[in-house]
Structure formats: structure tokens, C-alpha cells
Regions:
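Alpha-helical transmembrane bundles and membrane-interface segments of multipass inner-membrane proteins
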Residues: 1-165
Length: 167
């Protein structure tokens, strides 16, 4: 059977989604918020939940952000389809497939995780809690977990966390 760039992209997306969600579910049900596990001196699994966009920036409402993510994934999916159809290099198709899978994983988090998990503050979250989840549909937090401490630095004392947050 001949290798197809389209099926290669689908395989990358499916494998990454399965690994991503399995690892996120394991982390949510086995680690407390802000707990870390050292894999190597330069790679940690670090459990944090992202309530907004990149770095936790909360500029717009959660519902709008979730809808924006869904629309963006539609555009990325169409772009990926065009790349395969126009016979682009598979290396580039694979890179866009990784981005696409990561974006879909974030949508899964924001759509479902608020409903199927309880909160993670000061406890290990439980799956399908009796009292329901911590938020409604499209209001879940995105689970972030990879941490690469490649540069060790300290911010000056006059820079506080509140200065780094978008208002």
C-alpha cells in the first residue's frame, strides 16, 4: 500500500489526540494542581490549568474563547486539507497536523473538562463527580502539562504576578 500524505496527517492527529487526552486525564486524576514530576533535569510534567488563552491571559469571555477555538480549528483543518490536496511536503503537513491536534485537544478540554471533572484546587480531581463538574459546557479549563526549564532566571522584586496578568 502506498503512503498517503492525507492518511499520514490523520494518523498523526489521532495518535497525538489519544496520547494528549490519556495523559491529561491521568494527570488530572493523579496529581494536584501545580504538582510536578521530573522526567529528566530539563523536562517535567507540571500540572497547571489555563483559564484563558496563552499564559492564562483572560481578555475575552470563556464562551467566546471556546467558540473562537472551534472556528480557528475549522480554518486550520481547511488549511491542512489544502496542503494535502496541493501535495505540499509531508514534513510541513506533519507540523500543521501537530498544531491541529493540539488545538483540537484544547477544544476537548474547554468543552468537556468542566462538566466531567471537579475542581483541582487543593485536591486531586475526580472523574464524573456525583455533584457534577466545576463548570458548564464550553467553560472548562485547558490542562497544560509540559515544562522545560531550559533557562533559570528570576524576575526582579518590583515585578509581581499581578503586573503580568492582562486586565
Amino acid at each position: 500500500m502506498k503512503f498517503s500524505k492525507g492518511w499520514g496527517a490523520v494518523l498523526i492527529i489521532m495518535l497525538l489526540l489519544i496520547l494528549d487526552q490519556a495523559l491529561k486525564i491521568w494527570i488530572k486524576t493523579h496529581m494536584q494542581l501545580h504538582e510536578s514530576i521530573e522526567i529528566t533535569p530539563w523536562f517535567y510534567l507540571y500540572f497547571t490549568e489555563n483559564p484563558g488563552m496563552a499564559f492564562g491571559i483572560e481578555v475575552i469571555g470563556k464562551l467566546f474563547l471556546s467558540i473562537f477555538r472551534i472556528v480557528a480549528v475549522g480554518f486550520i483543518g481547511y488549511y491542512l486539507y489544502k496542503l494535502v490536496k496541493d501535495k505540499y511536503n509531508f514534513g510541513f503537513i506533519a507540523c500543521v497536523s501537530l498544531i491541529f491536534a493540539g488545538a483540537i485537544g484544547n477544544i476537548i478540554d474547554s468543552v468537556f473538562y468542566g462538566v466531567v471533572f471537579d475542581h483541582s484546587f487543593g485536591q486531586i480531581a475526580s472523574f464524573m463527580p456525583a455533584g457534577g463538574g466545576y463548570a458548564g459546557w464550553l467553560h472548562g479549563k485547558v490542562v497544560d502539562m509540559f515544562y522545560f526549564p531550559l533557562i533559570q532566571t528570576v524576575l526582579p522584586d518590583y515585578v509581581s504576578y499581578t503586573h503580568l496578568r492582562a486586565h
